[in-house]
Amino acid sequence: MISLIQAPHDTPLRIIDFKGGHGIRRRLLALGLHRNHIIELDSRSIFRGPVLIKDVTSDTSIALGRGIAQKIMVEIVGERK
């Protein structure tokens, strides 16, 4: 289990847990992100800035702040494309 920030690009990831309180969980659920959801890390800046993830099931992209992305714990479920 690793943080979304540490995950490799273009690799299917399963959301395992959200580190944080009820507010962060509610916000991520409102964005359509929940446990066991499959996503891919699409883009991440080297030092700071937003993280872009792709929802594999709906083929949509979501931009998250780096602080929120650090609170999303994922596991790798497949090989790179």
Give the role of each language-model region.
Residues 8, 45-46, 55-57:
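A generic beta-sheet turn/junction motif
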Residues 20-21, 37, 43-48, 60:
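Short, charged beta-turn/beta-strand-edge "cap" motif at the junction between a beta-strand
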Residues 23-27:
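Short alpha-helix capping/helix-loop boundary micro-motifs
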Residues 52-81:
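C-terminal structural segments of small proteins and small subunits
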Residues 15-18:
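PDZ/PDZ-like domain segments forming the peptide/carboxylate-binding groove
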